[in-house]
Curated annotation (Swiss-Prot):
Organism: Oryza sativa subsp. japonica
EC number(s) from the headed UniProt entry: 2.4.-.-
Presence of keyword Transmembrane helix: yes
Compartment(s) of residence: Golgi apparatus membrane
Protein name per the record: Sialyltransferase-like protein 2
Membrane-traversing stretches: 7-23
Family assignment from sequence similarity: Belongs to the glycosyltransferase 29 family.
CDD domains, per the entry: GT29 (cd19952)
Keyword line: Glycoprotein, Glycosyltransferase, Golgi apparatus, Membrane, Signal-anchor, Transferase, Transmembrane, Transmembrane helix
Record topology, Lumenal segments: 24-396
Sites where a glycan is attached: 72, 260, 304
Amino acid sequence: MKRRHLPPVLVLLLLSILSLSFRRRLLVLQGPPSSSSSSRHPVGDPLLRRLAADDGAGSSQILAEAAALFANASISTFPSLGNHHRLLYLRMPYAFSPRAPPRPKTVARLRVPVDALPPDGKLLASFRASLGSFLAGRRRRGRGGNVAGVMRDLAGVLGRRYRTCAVVGNSGVLLGSGRGPQIDAHDLVIRLNNARVAGFAADVGVKTSLSFVNSNILHICAARNAITRAACGCHPYGGEVPMAMYVCQPAHLLDALICNATATPSSPFPLLVTDARLDALCARIAKYYSLRRFVSATGEPAANWTRRHDERYFHYSSGMQAVVMALGVCDEVSLFGFGKSPGAKHHYHTNQKKELDLHDYEAEYDFYGDLQARPAAVPFLDDAHGFTVPPVRLHW
């Protein structure tokens, strides 16, 4: 090194030392980064988050079904033989062959009381209004926005917050558990898909504050009971117990209208249709954990996940959505009947043993485990600004 370059180099070195010293003092004064600033970074694997946030073919399909019903559905009712009841038909135009003109195809058929329903035109208008609200919610969520913001609104939907909540799953592991009194001691008890409690009280309790169902349950109730039972007999825990329902098929919104039309003051039909944002949030969480489990178990790229799961039908379980709802309305959440063991029935109240392929139960178990042990690691809930995951306990 030539001597004439030495002084400038020393000057630069001195400035670097002074700058480093100043930065250290500044860091001491400011302290470490706050948790709020660090929480702005999305939780979880970025690629899996991006893939999970894609609503996929299933969402597109249900939107297309709702739009087609809104535009083309017709409703007709006819008296039965002897005029004991009326037959209701929901129909859609359908081309039975490529060259044939479309003809009405029956989508749903119900037997209803003679005088319980409004005229066909008014009933169709009400059905279209329900479909319109359903489509609007889905389209708003499709345009982006923070779907996790729904977590701050859930308490308002139920009218209040609750201190302790029990979400009672339907797993056969509850049989012989003796958890009934422990479940009933909670302020809010959520049960799934109208599972029976009679005969199982010692293990599952009897108290029910909210019934959470998928719309297939309501459809079955309406098909069986609309003719004979007020409000379709779809509130087995009592008419005062509200039902929260997520929509599997848009046509099931007609069942809700029918059951509401046959309700009476002594047999009301309190129904809450889940917010489209809650549906989207649950779908993303379920898909994220399923993607993560697939990558971990197979070593394959996440893009290959569709080889194992058909996106058109993949869906979170009713229990998982009930758990997410409880997170938004409860200060403490306890889960019962969400595990499985060798030889245990799939449902404690039926003889079913096989799990449904459209759900990834193992991935959902991973989600519940994170809620209990690592709540800050749950993706997408971190997008709900101002929301903190309450303590969660798994009792299986």
